[in-house]
């Protein structure tokens, strides 16, 4: 119903966009007369007018006309009317639904240019690093021609390179990189370590893939945790000995395993324990479940491959190998044990955010995709994004044939090879979509037997993917691809002219970024030649029927199927598509497979005779709808629970930023001191009468906090006639607060004598940042475990979400109290030493070559102390700086966990990080042990009970 309501205003929006496009078109005549220099000068004119109060909406027609003309002069491509409509929809903060081949990448240039004029930055999000780099170079040529800076964020960049890219007018990158940089900035210890400059306007390419599919998996930065691989190895030995349906059951639909009583007894016998489920053995249950999942649900060459003794995840949707990424919660270690390769340690969470809440940080969102209408309700509900279907430039003439269903997979693949051989004979290009590396290699072997030349595009050979796709529309080209979602390169009949031209120029040593002038000159010379060659070949391909897309299996998402089909029939070209299915396909087995098999049995058809039945089509659609609905529920649930964490995250990150930006913390620390001592006094004076107070215990506790300078006797008997009853709670509190203030002033004088003026402010900054980070990390553990068990509250007729919100709030307030107490204790008791300041101007830190060196550089920068740029002068005045022992240790390498390109699995990528983790955090072998370790570490971080007198 909501989807229908959202579509009511589509017609009006399209008409409005058509008027904008017509107005831009009317300005083209005047813009075409401008010289290159005059066209470039328009950017400065727009910036000036915007600074004087003219809005971007008012500048839109002229800016679009200028950017359109620049695209024609630089790329030889003039955006069509429908692309102008799409560009306007993006600027207005909508999702532009543009079919494959309609030029979404070129469309994004116009709103990016317009919003780049504002000077607050534009982020363009793509699905992978290759496309981010390609688009920043390709479309960046237009922006650079017009005088705007263009940057790109890639996985292996150093912090300095990232900062330069973010300071550009327009920045390209992937959602994971943008999100991780946000988290790293909120783990930084100086402003110099921060790279982002705010969240103004974002354009998301393949918006449904990024904001819908990948939204199921949060971004997580984690640090190394101690752990033993013995249990993984032991359970990898037991899993093959256990029998399915006897010892355990498997639910393929929900991707879960359940251990039967016989299975529990078997494991207990093998391990020599009495009760698997008693408290001491409960961590073993997780090892058992992961071992069985690794055996039944994770298949080699489909879900992962093993290369050079390492388990590498294969993206289910796109078929790419996700280098360096890992499953979480011990799943990757279980697979490593199954495959008998080195088992690497688990990690502990340091920072996390969901994609939904990251993209909500932006003032304005927009997105592009070919398949968003089915998700319009979700995009509107979560991101407040409207979906606007943009008409195609030319009518679609592709023929979508009905599915062919075979009884066995073998019969299906024989039919596929026969069909492809027939198309190859007449010179028609064919694109075959498969769902796994294993299937693509099987088909490749069959084609080789039949002597059919072909290219394979899958997880093992993805380095060549752009080149293979660019030529997939040439005469007789046969391309086998694991999946086409997010590939990002157009399949043009006769060959992709832009790609082929670029390849020739790069082969001659030219580069659009390194040698822009020579590249542009050669481009205009080479482009007409390539166009002519490709045009002649395209004519032959059209006669043969255009591109034929053949799917070998239906995907669980209809959008992925539609994206595969959409590769054919772009820009009004002829084309054809068909799916070949069998009862052995994953989707068929998970839903309604038995009913279809009984139907085929009753029909008594031979294996090699397919059926085309509406009932089967309906069953497939029903299965896909069920999966999509399940995934939607998962995403909604993730968002509901993360909203609790999001509010807490905002408080912590805002506080960190305030500290980083150099605000004077002296008053805040004094307020903390007041709160902590007040809490101590309240706890000791809870009984109503002074004679009932245990002041000795209070003094013992206070001495762990600061060097107490008054004695209980002084307070109790101020003169010979006074009585203990004369001491009130307020008098006690005021006396202790006055004493603590004097002690803090003495501590400040001591440190300034040691390291010069401003030393105490520097220590306050360092201590607060480190304590906040430590307590936040511990809080993340606690919230994680609270969420794991909160579902059981439903058995007590309580709403788990409400309980999570209530208990999460209580835990957060307790954490803030802990931050105050630990900070005060550290400020009084931490051991410090003076470090000589450098005698010369501080040179820039050498840029590390890759993320593995990221942490070392970050830690070195963090040890500079201070509050960043605003306090640079203050740092220079101090003859030396302080180093606090125990809170400025070296940073460990970090691990990044986020969604793959489809969001189907939580994975991890190793690298360095910008924040420090206190050393000596014993993480434990199991999640329960890690939790206890976090608690112990939190307790152990409190100040020593004796204070060294000076």
From Swiss-Prot:
ATP binds at residues 83, 101-105, 490. Pfam families: P-loop_SecA, SecA_DEAD, SecA_PP_bind, SecA_SW. Gene3D superfamilies: Helical scaffold and wing domains of SecA, P-loop containing nucleotide triphosphate hydrolases, SecA, preprotein cross-linking domain. One of its GO terms (cellular component) is cytosol. Residues 864-950 are annotated as: Disordered. The keyword Transferase does not apply. Its main location: membrane. InterPro entries: Helicase_ATP-bd, Helicase_C-like, P-loop_NTPase, SecA, SecA_CS, SecA_DEAD, SecA_motor_DEAD, SecA_preprotein_X-link_dom. Its EC number is 7.4.2.8. GO terms for molecular function: ATP binding; protein-exporting ATPase activity. Keywords: ATP-binding, Cell membrane, Cytoplasm, Membrane, Nucleotide-binding, Protein transport, Translocase, Translocation, Transport. Monomer and homodimer. Part of the essential Sec protein translocation apparatus which comprises SecA, SecYEG and auxiliary proteins SecDF. Other proteins may also be involved. This is Protein translocase subunit SecA 1. It comes from Mycobacterium ulcerans (strain Agy99).
